[in-house]
Amino acid sequence: RDTDRSRGLGDVYKRQKRQLMERGVQIGADVPYCIMRGTALAEGIGEALSPLPPMVKCPVLIAKPSISVSTKFVYQNLKLDDTTIHPDIDRLIDDIKAKNLHDIAAHMGNVLETVTIPNYPVIDEIKKHMLSNGAVGAMMSGSGPTVFGLFDDEDTAKKAYKAMRSSHLARQVYLTSVYNNRK
């Protein structure tokens, strides 16, 4: 009986979570991801999510410059036919499964950078600053302007955090780590 109840509660939880995700997309494309948690492949406008194995644990430096970027502007000006940056998603998924941080960093990419960076060069400056301070990879998140850098050790990440704060390239700077918790 207890097992049946537990299974029943688990089914209710999964159904409620799915409903929350469906409703959440009406608020914003990122909401379903926040509800789902963990590593996922996002498709469409970010609302179609497929769970992936957990990302390798690593320090992450996040930097947001003192600018705002219109997501609408970025998508209106995105010309996929003219874009040479096309991340190999299948290879990146294999890198995530293999938990190879350096390969993940080498194969990650964001086509939206082709629109955002020419209009807001500080984003590229932040990426270069992270890389020159030890990040194994740095990329703009979504349509921007926030940039994240992946590090393979805590000490390097802490030094990069201090360097980013003193550079004044970003108004908000955070040092965190990959969080893998999916229930």
PLM features: what roles do these ranges have?
Residues 2-13:
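Single conserved hydrophobic/aromatic residue that forms the stacking wall/gate
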Residues 14-137, 150-183:
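ATP-dependent small-molecule kinase catalytic core of the GHMP/sugar-kinase superfamily
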Residues 147:
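Catalytic nucleophile-His microenvironment captured as a short glycine-rich beta-strand/loop
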